[in-house]
Amino acid sequence: MAYRQILAIVLFLCVFQFLDCTVSSAVEENGTVFVYGRAAVGTIDEDFICATLDWWPPEKCDYGSCSWDHASILNLDLNNVILQNAIKAFAPLKIRIGGTLQDIVIYETPDSKQPCLPFTKNSSILFGYTQGCLPMRRWDELNAFFRKTGTKVIFGLNALSGRSIKSNGEAIGAWNYTNAESFIRFTAENNYTIDGWELGNELCGSGVGARVGANQYAIDTINLRNIVNRVYKNVSPMPLVIGPGGFFEVDWFTEYLNKAENSLNATTRHIYDLGPGVDEHLIEKILNPSYLDQEAKSFRSLKNIIKNSSTKAVAWVGESGGAYNSGRNLVSNAFVYSFWYLDQLGMASLYDTKTYCRQSLIGGNYGLLNTTNFTPNPDYYSALIWRQLMGRKALFTTFSGTKKIRSYTHCARQSKGITVLLMNLDNTTTVVAKVELNNSFSLRHTKHMKSYKRASSQLFGGPNGVIQREEYHLTAKDGNLHSQTMLLNGNALQVNSMGDLPPIEPIHINSTEPITIAPYSIVFVHMRNVVVPACA
């Protein structure tokens, strides 16, 4: 017993020293996290975390920066050990294959009559490239890779095939699905597992480069459903049918979901709420709570459309890179981006969004992995820790105190307790917070609760009756928000020479102590001994 008590004291002193070093120059403010634990407000998929692989060739450049290198579906080094380990760590990772060029891709199936040629840059035509092709040899290699890494694959199909594009971007005609059906059949006959087939990329609403009306898109989606039903008639479960994979517009999505009826399993929208990657004010937006709150409107609107329509589809974020046109170096691939990314994951969960696909797994300046050496960027570790700690049920959570704290709570993945995510967007103030459990709420998550009522919850003791919690404090190396090295409890997260990922280990804190959130830091708090009705 004495040994354990001494060990607990040593651990506490280590934690205290770490926190003291990170906040010594800061002012301190108290706050309270209120968690409504009687019922979940949102439920996410078990494989909620998703990332994208794109089609962009090395010639893809934005604002004079060429950030894609060999990160395309067609040229990515599938033998890279770090890449394989990074995917395996999620067990499984959902990967959505798609992007702008998917709508000018043909598939080299045995019955294809067209030559299989690579994309060629041509700025005078739609999307800036000539038609490209997916060789079936490469498709074989990709599927061997997916099987080896345990990847769950969502494949985005070319939805412009057969249509003509007017000068104003309007796409005329129905989807010619001949090549797509042949590709789907080839995939099934080779026993390649696809979890979902998605129709088109950013063709809904106003579109990006081209657009398809909601009524026609619904007809095309029904045709995709019929193809999937034919090809997979003896397969269970069938792949999902997904669409439209574009930017959210209320009227378009309302019409589409009502007319697509039950042909659709998941409706996908894209999010680039931070604006262009060239914007000099990206960090200001990321650290502004009011700016972060704005995306809640679209989450709420889509949730309501689904609720009030005849569809059985669920909401997904099919692609989200924050800053469009490949992001911004040392921002979207640096520590500061985790404030935006984790806030998005938390907000999406609250509004019952089942899957969230980050643009990208690798490629551009917003990849979870470095494009050239494959080492994980900070957001990779943020996603991995989320995956390990945050369970499927999202709990309504508010914070009373500074507006610079973002707070989210889920039932824990590893226990019947809860995991609280706290992010401090302030650069000088250390926040010392306590957690209280409540059984009533009346306002949205962006507002403070005005009245509280204690819930009946239970706390169970650990060894020797000492109740402990597990904390994961994430900070930037040297306090630099532009750093691409993330510290976990003061230690750098880095792969070793063998390409192995570092262990994700918490510090243990006596649960009677408040939670300390240092300036510009992120804290995951696993409270395995807090039992609330929603998580029981």
UniProtKB/Swiss-Prot annotation:
Leader sequence residues: 1-24
Domain of life: Eukaryota
A Pfam family recorded for this sequence: Glyco_hydro_79n
Topology with respect to the bilayer: Peripheral membrane protein
Keyword Transmembrane helix: no
Gene Ontology cellular-component terms listed: extracellular region; lysosomal membrane
SUPFAM superfamilies per the UniProt record, alphabetical: (Trans)glycosidases
Disulfide-linked positions: none
Keyword annotations of the record: Glycoprotein, Hydrolase, Lysosome, Membrane, Secreted, Signal
Intracellular or extracellular location(s): Lysosome membrane; Secreted
Name of the protein in question: Heparanase-like protein 3
Source species taxonomy: Eukaryota, Viridiplantae, Streptophyta, Embryophyta, Tracheophyta
